[in-house]
Every structure is written in structure tokens, then in C-alpha cells.
């Protein structure tokens, strides 16, 4: 997950499209560049990214979730490169590269006249003031969060799937509307994720809600690397093929080292010996239905 510093929030609200585009582009370029480096993974990765703009209290909090497999294609596309156990890419390197790429892209957008400055931000339209305003961004650590999914890949997809076509808050978090106040639940990460009520005036609630309306036609789910729209048609089947070959090779090594182990190939029901009749690749497993259970005669 890549998060923009809170210092950028006012600028984001006046320049949603350009800054959200920069967030997508620079976070993706960071992952691709660091993963490609032979000192880290040395592979071409593929991933999809989902934009979220809200915090639990509905304040502006732009960040992107990136769902990345633990590996990628070798530079010559002949093998699948696996990441090390419990380690994918160095967090500190990702933070520094992301920070540098985003601030550089922001400076370029300013030089190209793409940014809008209104109200309290009007003075930032002056180059020397904008440059001074940017300096603290170089000195702080930007938030990059890496975590292996607790419940596996399916859980991650289910979690993100709840938000892909919703905005900011779902109905089940709304508690009450009494005397001109809207109360909703929020999770306090500083207090063991306890759920707490937050009462807001109607005006304040609507203001916070409207912060998260995206520009018309904005695409909030994007694919990169070997999942990019123009590349996945050829590269995704190759990934399945290489993943299948790699897993089959590992399975054969495992069988060779354990096939004589006592009781390994015994039926858990009757205790009789079992024999391997077929091995399936991951792609084949996904395409097959589970075996039917036939009733005993």
C-alpha cells in the first residue's frame, strides 16, 4: 500500500485527477523498478492497483492498494522467479523511490502549468513558494506498507472487492440520524481497532462524503506489468505455464525424497496403499470442478 502524506491533502482536493494519476503512475513505477533490480527480485512483476481516498473518519487519505504475486518473470521470460519466504521487496527502498518519483512528478506538473491553486493555496502558484512548500516532503518517511495476506489471496480479493464500486462509507456503518446529527462507526487503529461511534452534523458529514467523489470517468482500478491490458494476453498464459512447470518440478523432487516414507501414500479412510495417477498444474486445477461424491450402493 502506498499512501500520500497528509501535507498533500489540500492540493489533492483541488487537483484530484492529476494527483491521483500521479499516485497510480509513481507507485506502479516504483514497484516495477525495484522488483526489476537484480539486487532485490530481478524479475518483471504484474499487479493490479485499487485507489482508496478515505480514512475511517471519512477524511481525505489517498492511498493505493497493490495486489502483487510473490514473484515474476525472469528478464528473458524463460522462468518464474520466486521471492524469498517472508520477504518480497525492501520497504525502505520502496519508500525512498516512491517519494522521489512522486515529488519529481509533482514538480514537473507544476512546471507544465497543470496544477490549480485556489483559496488558501493561491500563494503556491509562485515558483519559489511552491519549492519551499515541497521541501518538508523530502525529509519525511512516506508510508509504504507491505504485508503478506492474513487469509490468503482469496481474502485480499474479497476485501478489496467490497470497495471497488463503493464510495467512502457503506450503509452498515451508519448508526443513527437524530437531531441533525449523523452517527457512524469507525475503527480506531490506535486502540486495537475498536469500533467507536462518531457523531457529525449533517453538513460536516456531507462535506466529508463529497471529498471522495472522483472526477467523471476516472478509472480507480488499474493493471500494470505483465497484467497490463496490452501485455497480459501473451504474458499471463506464459506465467501460468512457468508456474505450472515450477510447481511440478518441486512436486517431483518432493516425491523422490519422500516416496519411501512409511504411511505417506496410505488412504486416510481404509489405510490401503495409494498410487499417483495424474498431476495437475495450477491452471488445470482452477478449470476443473471438484469431484462428485457418489452414494454407496
Predicted regions and their residues:
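Beta->alpha loop/short-helix hinge microenvironment recognizer with preference
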Residues: 1-297
